[in-house]
């Protein structure tokens, strides 16, 4: 007796239909192309080999109480340049009796966890009761220059020329000593004949190199005394006070000149010292000061200005019973590109009240790892391009964009059944897939024509079923990826130009950045919708091809025992080919001809420039689908007589 045996697609109400370009799919399950990720609080780095830290006892592995005294792991401590009791500002000014450490090192990303050792608790005077405002200005300049440099170093001995009549001086309010920078020089005068002394003229040189460190820019403390009135300074009738720094061309670059600037007008009778932070290029500079007193720059921090990179500043405060300042916090928040790590609770140490805080350890634990994105909101190492909430800038790396979960396209999963057809739901997408409205002029927009996706599918369409070839879909992936790269590059240029135009308005930059991010998210979701449709169509075609491959294999196995009368259907004589024979042909010796479908291997990798500020996302698309490995599920063997 002859019977007809066919491969038949079986789809029931549990399947959902997914439309694609060139073919559709029925599937038992579906999943979002990406899940939303949540940033982890604290600090991390993009690359373990390209960062360096600057710290104090809380990162100092030579501390006798390490690791209990530390807020970082042993691995992270190895990345820090630290000394117990030290701070960048202490090394800059060198107050008597304090730790003086040579801070220097190189790294694209710099993490600063120091500053607490110069705080109100330190009670440093030297003609200034409160140094917090100077510390704020110092830290801000350090963060700014560090973000533009690969290497930085303290220069702890500048070449100088001091006038013969000046000798090193001391001050009673500075432990009967004085700062190492600036150094105090005084003139010995003999009233009444030489009651005023001579004007001071001194020179110092900022080097182009310090050891192995190149110096293209120096941070210098321009210090001078502030008198409340001329009478306070001019008790001997010696004219007005001045202390001025000049560059080699004679231009004033720092200091104070009471010959042209008014005194404070306050009622005090003791001068205070002010130190302005100035950024100077290498070269020879002169210092002129009124007789009797000279404050001479003797140190600087030098920067090579060779590479832009992230800066992370970690809140540096004492535990209970010690007074702290928040200069580090304020300096970082007012410096573009600086990410601030802050505690939510008071500092509570394990080794003592001031060392080994558990909350800070958790916030800094991310320094042991590499992240895909670091930002003020935290760090992310998942590959998803979407997060539930907008990540606060600054941010660097491949940072996810804010999106709603329901807006992320879904792709078919589980049991997949192909069906011919053309997607009718996405043939008219939005007229452009990227845009940040009319604020940005001249951006490249990708137009989507009504007939399809405007040249992305380059192959010829099959007349039967209206689908596209596998090759054309693959070319579509390549072309859409290339076009989006061009789009992102053009956007980069436009954004950078706009940033330059409105750089004076920080709020405008923040507003524009948020708008751009929202547009990027919408654009990416639109792009993913197109990619999803391409994926569905490509898989559908591939599965149908696999069906024909399966039918061909059955025909080959059957030989003369079965005659293929149409694709997927055979006539067989069961008097000649019994059940075991049929099992051999159609079930491969009782082995199911339809093994479980492997997981859909799709990857969409979003890439960006190494750093967030002024950059634009780039989109690299790979859709690696092993068509040869996909075997049709949901196929039944149907017998009819």
From Swiss-Prot:
Region Fusion domain-1: start and end of each range?
A: 1-26
Provide this UniProt record's keywords sorted from A to Z. Disulfide bond, Fusion of virus membrane with host endosomal membrane, Fusion of virus membrane with host membrane, Glycoprotein, Hemagglutinin, Host cell membrane, Host membrane, Host-virus interaction, Hydrolase, Membrane, Transmembrane, Transmembrane helix, Viral attachment to host cell, Viral envelope protein, Viral penetration into host cytoplasm, Virion, Virus entry into host cell
Question: Which molecular function GO terms apply here?
Answer: host cell surface receptor binding; sialate 4-O-acetylesterase activity; sialate 9-O-acetylesterase activity
Give TM regions.
Answer: 617-637
PTM comment: the record says: In natural infection, inactive HEF is matured into HEF1 and HEF2 outside the cell by one or more trypsin-like, arginine-specific endoprotease.
Tell me, what is an example of a GO biological process annotation in this record?
virion attachment to host cell
Q: Where is this region: Fusion domain-2?
A: 352-637
Q: Which residues lie on this side of the membrane: Extracellular?
A: 1-616
Q: Does the keyword Glycoprotein apply?
A: yes
Task: Tell me which residues this entry annotates as catalytic.
Answer: 57 (nucleophile), 352 (charge relay system), 355 (charge relay system)
Q: What class of enzyme is it?
A: hydrolase
User: Got any disulfides in this one, which pairs?
Assistant: 6-569, 106-151, 126-174, 196-238, 215-302, 223-275, 332-338
Q: Esterase domain-1: where is this region?
A: 27-137
EC number in record:
3.1.1.53
Q: Where is this region: Esterase domain-2?
A: 297-351
Q: Give the span(s) annotated as N-acetyl-9-O-acetylneuraminic acid binding.
A: 137-296
Topology, Cytoplasmic side: 638-641
* GO CC, one annotated term: virion membrane
Question: Pfam families under this entry?
Answer: Hema_esterase, Hema_HEFG, Hema_stalk
- What residues bear carbohydrate chains? 12, 47, 130, 381
Localization in the cell: Virion membrane; Host cell membrane
What function does the entry list?
Binds to the N-acetyl-9-O-acetylneuraminic acid residues on the cell surface, bringing about the attachment of the virus particle to the cell. Plays a major role in the determination of host range restriction and virulence. Class I viral fusion protein. Responsible for penetration of the virus into the cell cytoplasm by mediating the fusion of the membrane of the endocytosed virus particle with the endosomal membrane. Low pH in endosomes induce an irreversible conformational change in HEF2, releasing the fusion hydrophobic peptide. Several trimers are required to form a competent fusion pore.
Complexes and interactors: Homotrimer of disulfide-linked HEF1-HEF2.
User: What is this protein called in UniProt?
Assistant: Hemagglutinin-esterase-fusion glycoprotein
The major lineage groups are: Viruses, Riboviria, Orthornavirae, Negarnaviricota, Polyploviricotina
Give the gene that encodes this protein: HE
